[in-house]
Amino acid sequence: MSEHDRELVSPEAALDDHAVESALRPRTLDEFVGQDRVREQLSLVLRSAQQRGTAPDHILMSGGPGLGKTTLAMIIAAELGAPLRITSGPAIERSGDLAAVLSTLREGEVLFLDEIHRMARPAEEMLYVAMEDFRVDVMVGKGPGATAIPLEIAPFTLVGATTRAGMLPAPLRDRFGFVAHMDFYSPEELELILHRSARLLGIELLDDAAAEIARRSRGTPRIANRLLRRVRDYAQVRGDGRLTLECARAALSLYEVDDEGLDRLDRAVLDALLRRFRGGPVGLSTLAVSVGEEPETVEIVAEPFLVRAGFIARTPRGRVATPQAWAHMGLTPPPDAAFGAAALFDPDEEP
């Protein structure tokens, strides 16, 4: 599978997505579509802090890629009228890296730490103290003679984002005063997002075309906007520039995004699960090897949607295909096929 095919319906941001995403991002909570419960709760947290004249509690947002966590972090800073500093867990390899960031924060600044679950453990321990006491302990010297020198830092608000909340240590998770879980979006919400994006991009998007794109966007705004741009390309080159239903269907068929929003990787996973493993159960690593992908790629890119859409069940014994998967792939299950009746297990566990 080519990188282009995989990236089209992947919730992860491609390099060329960032400039367009920046132009399409809502700037205020009122402009933000969807996540109504989170928006209402967040509005209360921010407004009450402003009325008290204090920094709001630290905020943790969890949910899949492409659901708006980074956008909300930017909106939080804008609503507070505060500067925003952006970094990520993988960039914090040592406690010194975190100390360098924290020591240069200005009072009231918002620090957005993406993929916070991937931060190095020594940095996590430093962050505990910084979040509670606005202090970092800088180690001077080495070995038994090393001394910790406390360094006061300016009060700040940490906004953490994670796609794997279960990987966060409890001491870190408990230090966030507000925890928000980002849900997948309804087709109706995605249609509103698509129409807004089309206006900003100067695209003539018909209602039925918007509904078709939304239905195949896996509940994820990032994917919806990406598909919108590919349908626009198709309409520009092979049509009259208008995004009609026929144009949307033809473009999405060309890019191998089917009626349920499945792409080539999704169908490869289902095909292997059904044909090679008779519907399962099968472990993640074995399933990933069978489609020539890394386990993390299958787990992060394909599996969340396949589980949510009802094609795969995660059971204590492994991944199991559902009757819906057999029907979608046009196959007949064997008489002894398992259908994932067992209780689902924690998404961060590996059978």
UniProtKB/Swiss-Prot annotation:
Q: Where does it reside?
A: Cytoplasm
Q: Which UniProt keywords apply?
A: ATP-binding, Cytoplasm, DNA damage, DNA recombination, DNA repair, DNA-binding, Hydrolase, Nucleotide-binding
Q: Which GO terms describe its cellular component?
A: cytoplasm; Holliday junction resolvase complex
Q: Tell me which residues bind Mg(2+).
A: 70
Which InterPro entries does the annotation name? AAA+_ATPase, AAA_lid_4, DNA_helicase_Holl-junc_RuvB, P-loop_NTPase, RuvB-like_N, RuvB_C, WH-like_DNA-bd_sf, WH_DNA-bd_sf
Give the span(s) annotated as Small ATPAse domain (RuvB-S): 186-256
GO term, biological process aspect, one = DNA recombination
| Reaction it catalyzes | ATP + H2O = ADP + phosphate + H(+)
Enzyme Commission identifier(s): 3.6.4.-
Task: Please list the residues that bind ATP.
Answer: 24-25, 66, 69-71, 132-134, 175, 185, 222
Whether Transmembrane helix counts among this entry's keywords is no
Q: Name one GO molecular function term.
A: four-way junction helicase activity
Location of region: Large ATPase domain (RuvB-L):
4-185
Q: Which residues bind DNA?
A: 314, 319
The similarity annotation says: Belongs to the RuvB family.
Quaternary structure note: Homohexamer. Forms an RuvA(8)-RuvB(12)-Holliday junction (HJ) complex. HJ DNA is sandwiched between 2 RuvA tetramers; dsDNA enters through RuvA and exits via RuvB. An RuvB hexamer assembles on each DNA strand where it exits the tetramer. Each RuvB hexamer is contacted by two RuvA subunits (via domain III) on 2 adjacent RuvB subunits; this complex drives branch migration. In the full resolvosome a probable DNA-RuvA(4)-RuvB(12)-RuvC(2) complex forms which resolves the HJ.
The job of this chain, per UniProt, is described as: The RuvA-RuvB-RuvC complex processes Holliday junction (HJ) DNA during genetic recombination and DNA repair, while the RuvA-RuvB complex plays an important role in the rescue of blocked DNA replication forks via replication fork reversal (RFR). RuvA specifically binds to HJ cruciform DNA, conferring on it an open structure. The RuvB hexamer acts as an ATP-dependent pump, pulling dsDNA into and through the RuvAB complex. RuvB forms 2 homohexamers on either side of HJ DNA bound by 1 or 2 RuvA tetramers; 4 subunits per hexamer contact DNA at a time.
Q: What is known of its domains?
A: Has 3 domains, the large (RuvB-L) and small ATPase (RuvB-S) domains and the C-terminal head (RuvB-H) domain. The head domain binds DNA, while the ATPase domains jointly bind ATP, ADP or are empty depending on the state of the subunit in the translocation cycle. During a single DNA translocation step the structure of each domain remains the same, but their relative positions change.
Q: What is this protein called?
A: Holliday junction branch migration complex subunit RuvB
In the UniProt record, what gene is named as encoding this protein?
A: ruvB
